[in-house]
């Protein structure tokens, strides 16, 4: 699997698109808003920002969320500017980054014809992997990234023994768990090294990563949602609808870290100070437009399955082909509903606010 080419959320605006099924991601951005506001406020109140404010959203995806975070950041700065009595807005440079397969066209079609901020705002698309350099040195003042850094640059090497699974699970050999962790360490270190060159001294980063509280890498806190998809695929293997060999070669390029693991990589790389780190949670039932659940477990399970389909379909399509898609997601939906009827399932988020050290 060539992750750079295959990994992207389902584009367009159809029923199963990411644009129509990214409500939980929007709520996570809202949950982290106090941390993001505190970081941008501290940045703008100091002497790092003068006439230009460069903000990058890494892993912006498409749909309504692509502009949500940066819009909120600009609003915060404008409110603060007026309170501080500063006459002129900074010129805003906004960089929206994702892998080349992202639906950037949809983002730019959604832009307002005229800026609705007092200052000048320049918006740029930046296709490419954030596991590499994206910007010149000392370009950025603020980086935001939400629900992106759990994706790895590649499927870990040496996990051929992960048969019957598509991700980390309690049935995985220890070697598989170790391989996933090693890939996370390599990727996260590279991410931090690249950003250290691109962010100005005193600049800020707020990163929200799908993760876990537990130090158990195979904890259901982070792995259950993929285990249920593996069960749906294995049902189809047992019925002869999917080749077992093909199933055994499919693995999700993702690692959901604990706060301890994230902190360890930041301290090891050494270019950023940790201003704040915490874990939060959000229930699966929040995969609705209003985010309050409140429907039947069947409705909630259906919404979770659609949210996950918008994320996972491009990966499945590339490996298994189109013929299995409707069947596997129908089975997946039923398994999700069954699990949600028995327990309050939730996602764990690791949120970290960082300050670029002076060289």
Swiss-Prot record:
Gene3D superfamilies: Methyltransferase, alpha-helical capping domain, Vaccinia Virus protein VP39. Substrate binds at residues 18, 21-25, 147-151, 255. Changing residue 147 to S: Decreases activity 2-fold and switch in specificity for jasmonic acid as substrate. Its EC number is 2.1.1.274. Disulfide bonds: none annotated. It comes from the Eukaryota. InterPro entries: MeTrfase_7 (IPR005299), MeTrfase_capping (IPR042086), SAM-dependent_MTases_sf (IPR029063). S-adenosyl-L-methionine binds at residues 18, 59-61, 65, 96-99, 129-131, 146-148. Pfam families: Methyltransf_7. Belongs to the methyltransferase superfamily. SABATH family. This is Salicylate carboxymethyltransferase. The lineage of its organism: Eukaryota, Viridiplantae, Streptophyta, Embryophyta, Tracheophyta.
